[in-house]
Amino acid sequence: MPAFPRAELEEMIRRFVAANDECGKDGNWDRLAAFYAPDAVYTWNNGPKYEFVARGRDEIRKWVMGTEMEGLDKWTYPYVRTLIDDQKGEIIGIWRQLAPVVDDDGKPIEIGGTGGSWFRYGGNWQWTWQRDFFDQSCAAAGFLDLMQKGKLSKKMEERMKSGSRMPGWVKRSEFDWYGTVVDREDE
């Protein structure tokens, strides 16, 4: 991966985070797809048996910003730290996951654990690769707690019931995410 000017990487993540913040406010995640190259790959782990994989901007729009965000209207994902590697053109962003409902103290309910995204920049203000990471057990417990309290959207309850039948979910044995990492340091 070629090096990119640090200022360009800083501007890219600034633009992306600003758009992410707007999407959280209005619930329209679709516009984030414009930040991905036509052949970008976006993945995350879904526990011990599954990975989520979207290949190309169309699948990212349809699945990441579509089916995977259904029921999460008005949830916000504020970024609290970004780390930039301008030699590899990569950025790691650490974020929180906040529900649009409050607890008994009036604070937004938060999914515990650490959430983050690892991006590879390809120039032209587009990501070519993204790998998200978050605490699956905290997410599951948080969503279940919200559902039991009647604070989870009906759409999200439906999604939880569908489990691994969501588009983009593949068995871990069928997808090697490490193989998608360019310029690995363990090779």
What would you call each of these model-derived segments?
Residues 2, 10-11, 38-42, 60, ...:
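A generic structural signal for ordered alpha-helices
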Residues 29-92:
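A solvent-exposed, acidic/Ser-Thr-rich amphipathic alpha-helical stretch
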Residues 3-4, 68-187:
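A beta-strand edge to alpha-helix "cap/lid" segment located at domain peripheries
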Residues 11, 15-18, 34, 62, ...:
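Charged/polar, solvent-exposed surface patches and flexible loops
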Residues 1-34, 38, 172-187:
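Short, low-complexity N-terminal intrinsically disordered segments enriched in polar/charged residues
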Residues 13-20, 24, 36, 60, ...:
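Hydrophobic alpha-helical core bundles mediating ligand binding, dimerization, or RNAP-core interactions
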